[in-house]
Amino acid sequence: MLNQKIQNPNPDELMIEIDLCYELDPYELKLDEMIEAEPEPEMIEGLPASDALTPADRYLELFEHVQSAKIFPDSKTFPDCAPKMDPLDILIRYRKVRRHRDFDLRQFVENHFWLPEVYSSEYVSNPENSLKEHIDQLWPVLTREPQDHIPWSSLLALPQSYIVPGGRFSETYYWDSYFTMLGLAESGREDLLKCMADNFAWMIENYGHIPNGNRTYYLSRSQPPVFALMVELFEEDGVRGARRYLDHLKMEYAFWMDGAESLIPNQAYRHVVRMPDGSLLNRYWDDRDTPRDESWLEDVETAKHSGRPPNEVYRDLRAGAASGWDYSSRWLRDAGRLASIRTTQFIPIDLNAFLFKLESAIANISALKGDKETETLFRQKANARRDAVNRYLWDDENGIYRDYDWRREQLALFSAAAIVPLYVGMASHEQADRLGDAVRNRLLTPGGILATEYETGEQWDKPNGWAPLQWMAIQGFKMYGDDHLGDEIAHSWLQTVNLFYQQHHKLIEKYHIAGGTPREGGGGEYPLQDGFGWTNGVVRRLISLYGEP
């Protein structure tokens, strides 16, 4: 698809006094109606049994003690530890000694668990290297080899090598990997592309979907569904033929559409919402409604300040993580307050564009295999989704795509997610032209395009720019003939990354691009991470198209 033109269109301990009271939104379903509208999901088909327990499930009160005591600066550290013995024995020992006067929780953890390996300190960048050389030399540093599953570890073993983003992220991530893959072929690493293709197909076969990442605590959710884009990339770069992945694409589609057939208008189940007119659109979802293992304390604190039932807040926080945009004003009712998060009440433009791509890919590959019936069915599904998106998510007055608040039945915020319909070929030429004007006027800066127009302190908001958004905007506008805007974003982003690299000799997760010299992007629940997989991948691909800045 690259550069192609589109031709056709203990609870008491957790309580604090707050000055907020929970007022039921008149557009929200009341609790008794909520139970009917959002029935409890069944266990995900294919989910492995005991060895897929999350650390919170496995260590119970020990887990909560460790996380609430903050013995590690990062909430993700303990979930990533591996036990040195049977977890049940550890839990029994903990229950025997925890009330001793001289009990040391940190020492107990260090005696009974292997702490996560730290890889970043092993690599020192050569300041003489060009940006391209730096990226090419980083791939081995970010590569993890297949390993036997450490008993009771949260890490899910994969059959082949894979790339991790870097920093605190020592596992592979679903949608990150697509943007990382963009650069692997340019660096001559088709071997890694093949490995990652096999890994994602394997996860679909074994779990029925691609999890957020290869950790047990990520199994209850996915991320933006980009496997169809990966398949397209594999074929373009001569890695694998698309036909071999048709069954995997269908399995992923079934995961995202689970329960759709039984819904009546204005009902939702898992990822699916049936709209008032009967059409189907999708939202982000997580099958759990507990604090995230990897951000347990942060989630508990957020829920305490919400004034809402904690399980609702936890579900929305988890769904926000599934979106990849964790977190953003896109999911907040009060843009300055994370506790107002309502992710499951929004129908996101990017998610539905990615699913349009998935439906189209299934139709196209079915046609290649001579399966006319499946081709016709999925072509109809894709067209129906596009019609529903145009009906509910297209703001004709302002010429932009926006998320849709299905509980309040109104359009939500404008963000850079609006460019995804262009990237997947779902927009008309008129929509692309009008969206281009809006992006120029509202999101474009000398350093690239902003995630949103709103400065909230969340990392997926102004003033931050992110590599995947730049790539989809560049390619999306160029595919619709707006080479000028696409090239401007490309040169601006390359300049941003290169200026920062010349000063600091590293690439990072996100950049502050709202004026002045590019610097580290802020916000989020964890310190800025360097490495960084998808920045490397996008920049390496752009260097091949535009040359080094």
UniProtKB/Swiss-Prot annotation:
Note one Pfam family from the annotation.
Trehalase
Specify which residues bind substrate according to the UniProt entry for this protein.
R168, W175, D176, N212, R221, S222, Q223, R292, D293, E294, G324, E525
Superkingdom, according to UniProt?
Bacteria
Q: Where is the active site?
A: D326, E509
What is the residue range of the signal peptide feature?
none
List this protein's GO terms for biological process. Answer: cellular hyperosmotic response; trehalose catabolic process
Q: Where in the cell is it found?
A: Cytoplasm
Sorted alphabetically, which Gene3D superfamilies does this protein's record hold? 1.50.10.10
Instruction: Kindly report, in one word, the top-level EC class recorded for this enzyme.
Output: hydrolase
The pathway this protein participates in, as annotated, is:
Glycan degradation; trehalose degradation; D-glucose from alpha,alpha-trehalose: step 1/1
| The keyword Cytoplasm is assigned to this record | yes
Q: Does the keyword Ribosomal protein apply?
A: no
**What reactions does this protein catalyze?**
alpha,alpha-trehalose + H2O = alpha-D-glucose + beta-D-glucose
This entry carries the following GO cellular component terms, namely: cytoplasm
Q: Keywords in alphabetical order, please.
A: Cytoplasm, Glycosidase, Hydrolase
Question: Which Enzyme Commission number(s) are listed?
Answer: 3.2.1.28
Q: Name one GO molecular function term.
A: alpha,alpha-trehalase activity
Tell me the subunit arrangement. Monomer.
**What family does this chain come from, according to its entry?**
Belongs to the glycosyl hydrolase 37 family.
Its job? Hydrolyzes trehalose to glucose. Could be involved, in cells returning to low osmolarity conditions, in the utilization of the accumulated cytoplasmic trehalose, which was synthesized in response to high osmolarity.
The record's annotation in NCBIfam families points to:
PRK13270.1, PRK13271.1
Name used for this protein in its record:
Cytoplasmic trehalase
Q: Which organism is it from?
A: Escherichia fergusonii (strain ATCC 35469 / DSM 13698 / CCUG 18766 / IAM 14443 / JCM 21226 / LMG 7866 / NBRC 102419 / NCTC 12128 / CDC 0568-73)
Q: Taxonomic classification, please?
A: Bacteria, Pseudomonadati, Pseudomonadota, Gammaproteobacteria, Enterobacterales
